[in-house]
A protein has these predicted regions:
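Conserved alpha-helical scaffold segments that buttress catalytic/binding sites
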Residues: 1-232
Length: 232
């Protein structure tokens, strides 16, 4: 379970056997448009984490209070999106089989599909909470069904209507917003409704997958995502 290219995230000092949470990276950006580089995300996130503290005064919690294991990055095929997704799915399925929670670092947003496939197989009735500037609901992008611009559309094919909850969305084609009006729960521009949704899902104990694209943040706070979208 340990990849050879490990620079661990700060505070992830547990062994795999003892861990409740297993972090792993998917350094993949083969369908990225506008500007490549998301494949360097997992290693960069780990490296920069050592400039932080493990304790959060906002949460009054410390990463060292939790049993987290960082298993490093997958070695993914850059020539085949489906092969890369299969590897991501297999690792998530292995972690779930061992009774642990997978935590995935990307990588472009398409990597989410591999993990969602595994989690939805383990937990029927899965809900997806999605933070993003973009709807990611295109049926295809430049003829490709497996694209960062289509990932939530492919996820919808797995979890179905009413199980995708989107926040901060402020960019996409008209057709994506029309699709969302019929099939997803979209909250445009901000996080309005998130607290109520979280309370509802916790009360009913339904399974949840959280996926975060950093461009949900305003470029003033996070300028590097591709492409950046203002007015967050």
């Amino acid at each position: 379970m340990i990849s050879p290219n490990v620079e661990t995230f700060i505070g992830c000092d547990s062994s795999y056997r003892a861990a409740d949470i297993v972090l792993y990276g998917a350094p993949f950006d083969s369908t990225t448009s506008y500007r490549p580089g998301a494949r360097f995300g997992p290693s960069a996130i780990r490296h920069e984490s050592f400039g932080l503290e493990t304790y959060s005064p906002y949460q009054n919690a410390d990463l060292t209070d939790f049993d987290i294991f960082d298993s490093g990055d997958l070695e993914l095929c850059f020539g085949s999106s489906e092969a890369a997704l299969a590897d991501i799915e297999a690792r998530a399925a292995e972690i779930l089989h061992d009774g642990k929670l997978p935590l995935l670092l990307g990588g472009e947003h398409l990597v989410t599909l591999g993990a969602v496939r595994a989690v939805a197989e383990k937990y029927p009735g899965l809900h997806i909470i999605h933070f993003d500037a973009h709807a990611d609901l295109r049926d295809d992008y430049l003829g490709a069904k497996l694209s960062h611009a289509c990932v939530l559309r492919r996820c919808h094919e797995i979890v179905g209507d009413g199980h995708i909850h989107q926040f901060c969305i402020r960019s996409g084609e008209r057709a994506e917003f029309e699709f969302a009006a019929q099939h997803t729960e979209m909250h445009k521009f901000d996080f309005t409704g998130l607290a109520e949704l979280t309370e509802q899902l916790c009360a009913t104990k339904e399974p949840v997958y959280l996926t975060i694209d950093l461009d949900c943040l305003d470029p003033s706070a996070s300028p590097a995502p591709v492409p950046p979208r203002p007015a967050a």
